[in-house]
Amino acid sequence: HGNTCPVMLSSSAQASLSGRFEGSVYGESKLAGEGLFREYSERTGAPVLIYRFPNLYGKWCRPRYNSAVATFCDAIANGRPYTVNDPSVELELLYIDDLVDEMLGALLGEEHRCGYDGLERVEGDDFCFVPETDMKSLGEIVYLLGCFRDSRETLSVPDLAEGSFSKKLWSTFLSYYEPGNFAYGLKPNIDDRGSFTEFLRTPERGQLSINVSRPGITKGNHWHMSKWERFLVVSGTASIKLRKVGEDTEGNPFPVDEYVVSGSDMRAVEMIPGYTHS
């Protein structure tokens, strides 16, 4: 009927029939589908967008079906058994949000085009692709997921750099916790002065802790050579005092710098290196 509306085919990397996909019946069926779409394009003049998607992953993907990442996420998050036959096997991984971004671009005629030489992407326009993919081994994936699971004990925060594989896998992993398992306990250190509880730790940006002080209690009275801290009172009122270590040119102690802060008027106070603080 003269309809030349563009059509998109969700094919698979297995259609290359290369490497470990050689002889894949599933790949052969996808390759046959690509051929039918090309014939349709030649017959009608309708543009065809053929995407050979690699391994997709993202929140709520069905485990124990056709996604290794989903299977590992579900098993490791919920204490189920799993098997890694060969940790060295590498997968090209495509995050679902990146796929959606590409599909929205394709609707606007902004798809990314390429050719293929086996599994290798080359210059060309016979196919479409999503630029944001990651090559990771099964061993790397399982190791990261184990770190994510253990983070409730270690309090560590993974690499959450924008666009990083770690951030995408972390968001995916969290979605596999079952309802009722979203909360976990912390370990407060309690004494007569109050309590100190670590909440988060990062390898490059320090940690976040909750410090509860009883009325009239003084904590601190020490200083650091290079360590830096930032205090924020969220409940009650506190007097935070700092004094530069050493003496001035006349041999007198440096003056005390005092900040009275409260939970009703939140202000962050820097614990400057080289200053005693309490």
For the regions a protein language model found, what residue spans apply to each?
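Conserved Rossmann-fold NAD(P)-dependent oxidoreductase catalytic core, especially the SDR/UDP-sugar
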Residues: 1-31, 41-44, 49-51
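Short, solvent-exposed loop/turn segments at secondary-structure junctions
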Residues: 16-19, 59, 248-250
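NAD(P)-dependent short-chain dehydrogenase/reductase
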Residues: 35-91, 96-109
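His/acidic/aromatic-lined binding-pocket segments of jelly-roll/cupin-type domains
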Residues: 93, 222, 228-233, 268-269
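Mid/C-terminal beta-alpha module of Rossmann-like enzyme folds, strongest
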Residues: 105-188
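A short glycine-rich, His/Asp/Glu-containing loop-to-beta-strand
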Residues: 180-221, 227
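Glycine- and acidic-residue-biased ligand/ion/polar-headgroup-sensing regions
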Residues: 226-248
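Short acidic-glycine-tyrosine-enriched beta hairpin
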Residues: 246-278
